[in-house]
Amino acid sequence: QEQMGIFKEMQNNGFFSFVSSYRASNSGVFGNMYHLMNQYDPATGKFGLDNTTEAMNAYLQQAEYRNTDWFDLLFNNSISMNHSISMSSGTEKAQYYASFSFMDDPGWYKKSNVKRYTSNINALYNISKKVSLNMIGNAAYRKQQAPGTTNSSGINGVTGDVSRNFDINPYSYALNSSRTLDPNAEYQRNYAPFNIFHELDNNYLNFDVVDIKLQAELKYKPIRTVELSVLGAYKFSTTTQVQTITENSNQALAFRAMDDATIRDNNSWLYKDPDSANSLPITVLPSGGFYQETKYKMNSWDFRATASYND
């Protein structure tokens, strides 16, 4: 109620007028109210909201008593599972050990689940009293989801605040969003419709991480006090990051938001030909969304030979 009281006072002072809010790049309760007032339904012959003081006060009163708990809606309790199994066997000539594990963490908020699979195999062969061979293999695979994000658009040199375009971090959104907003409604962001739950379903990251390591060590004791060993290891790892931004996401819609001349001229996500001074801004994304894939690979080899003397 206190927040809506401040909003009403700002409206009375001219901050939330129809002209400034209807075509604003970002707007909330007042912007949505003005959009409803301008939304005509030919089937019923009525607007989404009557342009009367009574209708506007009734709409704002609903927002006043809404008190949306964003943390409760965006975050939830979850149970993570971790299962593992190990086996060992062997004789005097050969010993074996193997272990496998699986982890499933559904996460505390939407699009934050993680699954991980790991395996370890260790084999030791006593070829003779003087020669032994140890072979080790490790493999791990992790699949993870996260909300979509973009690189930082600027850092405040005084406060250190980092700003991002199209930021949909659930914690940041819950911390900074007004409780007067309807969690099921769409509001204006970047001149396009925005709902945090809809955006999390249409703008997300997928991570696939693979790590494999193979190692072999050969030991030889020519005499009791001397041991020679040769070790060779190979490690391969790859990380694939895929960001999917569907055609229905706010980010994709912002790149083609040009409902009228005012929005077209002020939307920074439209393209204007620098070689044509009189050209109008156009969209570079008339349909579809974005698919961005980044892949990191690493291959490493390690060879080592040692000699030790112990009397």
Regions found by a protein language model. Name each.
Residues 89-93, 102:
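A generic beta-sheet turn/junction motif
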Residues 100-106:
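Transmembrane beta-strand segments that form the barrel wall of outer-membrane beta-barrel proteins
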Residues 74-78:
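Short Gly/Pro-enriched turn/cap motifs at secondary-structure boundaries
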